[in-house]
Amino acid sequence: MRYTKISMTDVIIAGAGAAGLMTAITAARRGLSVTVLEPNGKTGKKLRITGKGRCNVTNDSAPQEFLQKVCTNARFLKSSLYAFPPEAVKEFFDEAGVPLKTERGERVFPVSDNANDIADTLERMAKSAGVRFVRERLA
């Protein structure tokens, strides 16, 4: 078994899923050194299969409307949804070069209908922000 030594880093994130990648990008853009641990090898593994491989990125409803229509535990999501509302999510991916479209039910997908575009973009953005990835299991 091969082991990797992690040198000093400000932030260590366990998992390169959607939340881990977004957190890594945000922290790195704020000047922190970030290391993401991903033993599965590929980033965004589950993200790549969401929405039948199309990736339902967000819901295009206003936060309050979304909380009323969709959530059974709105208190859990409320602060996150208001901190990073659907408009901000759409703007984030538009600026990253991933155009989005809204379909019935206010579901938002990449125009390409390919979840890999979202996962690959998040990985590319993380790397360009200086995020380090460790892709093997650590002891």
Residue ranges with predicted function:
Residues 3-5:
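Short, positively charged and aromatic/hydrophobic N-terminal segments
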Residues 9-36:
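N-terminal Rossmann-like FAD-binding beta1-loop-alpha1 element of flavoenzymes
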Residues 20-22, 43-46:
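Short N-terminal binding/cap micro-motifs at the start of the first secondary-structure element
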Residues 54-102:
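Glycine-rich active-site loop/strand segments that organize a redox cofactor
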Residues 77-87, 104-124:
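Short beta-strand to alpha-helix junction loop
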Residues 134-139:
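A conserved short coil-to-beta-strand element within the FAD-binding core of flavoproteins
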